[in-house]
Amino acid sequence: MKASEIKGLSRDDLLKREKDAKEELFNLRFQQAAGQLENTARLSTVKKDIARIKTELWAQEIAAEKAKA
């Protein structure tokens, strides 16, 4: 998921995608522990997606605070 795709999403969509990504990360870690994970690069990709989503959520929060002031 690219940052440009994330910027256009609403807060609710971002929260839903964050939840889905965290669930996927949990499942990937479980597969890795069981020795069944084939694509280990997917772990870092999902972590980076979560970071991008959190960054955009934070940016939206800051923008909302600036709009109030």
From Swiss-Prot:
Gene3D superfamilies with a match to the protein in the record: 1.10.287.310
UniProt cross-references to InterPro entries, sorted A to Z: Ribosomal_protein_uL29, Ribosomal_uL29, Ribosomal_uL29_CS, Ribosomal_uL29_sf
Molecular functions per Gene Ontology: structural constituent of ribosome
Xref: CDD domains: Ribosomal_L29_HIP
Keywords: Ribonucleoprotein, Ribosomal protein
GO biological process: translation
A Gene Ontology cellular-component term: cytosolic large ribosomal subunit
Family matches, as PROSITE patterns: RIBOSOMAL_L29 (PS00579)
Keyword Ribosomal protein: yes
Family statement drawn from the similarity comment of this UniProt entry: Belongs to the universal ribosomal protein uL29 family.
PANTHER family, sorted: 60S RIBOSOMAL PROTEIN L35/50S RIBOSOMAL PROTEIN L29, LARGE RIBOSOMAL SUBUNIT PROTEIN UL29C
Stored NCBIfam families: L29 (TIGR00012)
Stored HAMAP family: Ribosomal_uL29
Protein's UniProt name: Large ribosomal subunit protein uL29
Organism annotation: Oenococcus oeni (strain ATCC BAA-331 / PSU-1)
